[in-house]
């Protein structure tokens, strides 16, 4: 099948086919996946290609959309407790390495990737406007800004014809607003007062109204607090799990007395290569034995049920009705309820709100107070003071040393 490309996509393909290091950035709907597929189609059969992503879930999605094998960066570079298998002294044997969701790259993982692919052409694909990684630095964003690596920016919105208010509001968030709300067109706002308990009540109401949507998820900035992820999961589990109730076997989780039981939606929180289930995969508990901590989880996207044989393995499972924004990078959901309240004021930023709303494919419900939204739209916190751009551009001031 011949893929139709716009001008920016054609330039990106040319860059990926020729540059030693290529950076491809664009928002949701700009055609990054189509551009990658077109590039892979253009490569000859003798070209050794490797695909990778920072997380297991992102790697699985990359494999699904390309029809090729993809792995985590840790697997690609052969990470062991003793270090990396592929390094600058013994790099990976590949002609081209493509890395998706590159905005998740911290400096440590990015440095390992650059060293371990020293023989290969490297293509980094992502969205420079998303949240910076949990780890130190914002490698992808700094490379985009530095001008020291060739960058292709995909600007055409290929989802605009769908009339998506998510796509319409995303660039508004990045420039500080204002955002548009249309309760009939997929972008709803529920304004509450300063009290965090009002947030919980509003989220509860929105979740009840959309309880028949299995793709519904609530996103909050942090785990802690009255309207954090842990507290919201305690509130939402009885609403969204029709099988919960008195007498049901459960496994306790964490200081907030979270529990998982049959019917509970859960998320895998670390890669388990033995069970072949990756960090970020979301499933439903279909069986549980509280006496030994074993469980069975059905993963619809994987098309299989995974048996967790012991409490040690099920310790990686957490309730997934509410998740942090960071935890959902690289994922999409039909309906997203976003908590944007001044209770989390120190964490609110444009990049966090942008990343949160762009997890939604169809509908966003924004819950919070006016102060919280104003704080998020005002705070351009993604611009971390990393100094990497200045280092790459050679503009760091010389240190003054007094003798």
Where are these regions (language model features)?
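Conserved RecA-like helicase motor-core motifs
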Residues: 47-52, 68-76, 151-153, 239-252, ...
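Helical mechanochemical/support elements of P-loop NTPase systems and associated helical scaffolds
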Residues: 8, 12, 35, 39, ...
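Conserved SAM-binding loop
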Residues: 5, 51, 98, 218, ...
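Walker A (P-loop) phosphate-binding loop of P-loop NTPases
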Residues: 29
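Conserved helicase motor core of SF1/SF2 NTP-dependent helicases
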Residues: 18-23, 38, 42, 46, ...
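C-terminal accessory regions
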Residues: 175, 267-271, 275, 279-403
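Conserved lysine of the Walker
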Residues: 32
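Conserved helicase motor core of P-loop NTPases
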Residues: 1, 11-15, 19-20, 129-275, ...
């Amino acid at each position: 099948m011949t893929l139709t490309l716009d001008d920016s996509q054609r330039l990106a393909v040319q860059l990926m086919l020729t540059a030693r290091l290529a950076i491809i950035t664009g928002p949701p709907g700009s055609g990054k996946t189509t551009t990658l597929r077109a590039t892979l189609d253009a490569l000859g059969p003798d070209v050794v290609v490797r695909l990778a992503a920072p997380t297991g879930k992102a790697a699985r999605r990359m494999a699904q959309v390309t029809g090729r094998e993809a792995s985590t960066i840790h697997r690609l570079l052969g990470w062991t407790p003793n270090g990396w298998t592929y390094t600058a002294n013994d790099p990976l044997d590949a002609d081209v390495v493509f890395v998706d969701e590159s905005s998740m790259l911290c400096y440590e993982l990015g440095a390992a990737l650059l060293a371990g692919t020293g023989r290969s052409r490297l293509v980094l694909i992502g969205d420079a406007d998303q949240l910076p990684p949990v780890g130190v630095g914002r490698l992808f964003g700094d490379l985009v800004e530095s001008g020291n690596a060739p960058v292709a920016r995909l600007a055409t919105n290929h989802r605009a014809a769908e009339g998506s208010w998510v796509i319409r509001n995303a660039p508004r968030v990045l420039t500080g607003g204002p955002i548009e709300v249309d309760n009939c067109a997929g972008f709803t706002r529920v304004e509450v007062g300063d009290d965090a308990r009002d947030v919980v009540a509003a989220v509860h109401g929105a979740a009840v109204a959309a309880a028949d949507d299995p793709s519904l998820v609530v996103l909050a900035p942090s785990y802690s607090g009255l309207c954090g992820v842990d507290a919201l999961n305690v509130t939402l589990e009885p609403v969204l799990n029709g099988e919960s109730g008195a007498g049901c076997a459960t496994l306790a989780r964490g200081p907030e007395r979270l529990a998982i039981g049959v019917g509970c939606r859960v998320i895998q929180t670390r890669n388990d290569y033995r069970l072949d289930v990756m960090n970020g995969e979301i499933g439903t508990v279909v069986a549980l034995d509280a006496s030994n901590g074993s469980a069975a989880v059905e993963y619809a996207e994987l098309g299989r049920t995974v048996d967790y044989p012991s409490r040690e393995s099920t310790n990686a499972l957490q309730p997934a009705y509410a998740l942090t924004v960071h935890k959902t990078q690289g994922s999409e959901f039909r309906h997203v309820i976003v908590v944007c309240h001044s209770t989390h004021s120190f964490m609110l930023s444009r990049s966090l709100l942008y990343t949160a709303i762009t997890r939604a494919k169809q509908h966003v419900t924004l819950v919070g107070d006016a102060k919280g939204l104003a704080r998020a739209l005002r705070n351009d916190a993604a611009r971390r003071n990393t100094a990497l751009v200045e280092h790459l551009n050679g503009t760091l001031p010389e240190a003054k040393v007094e003798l």
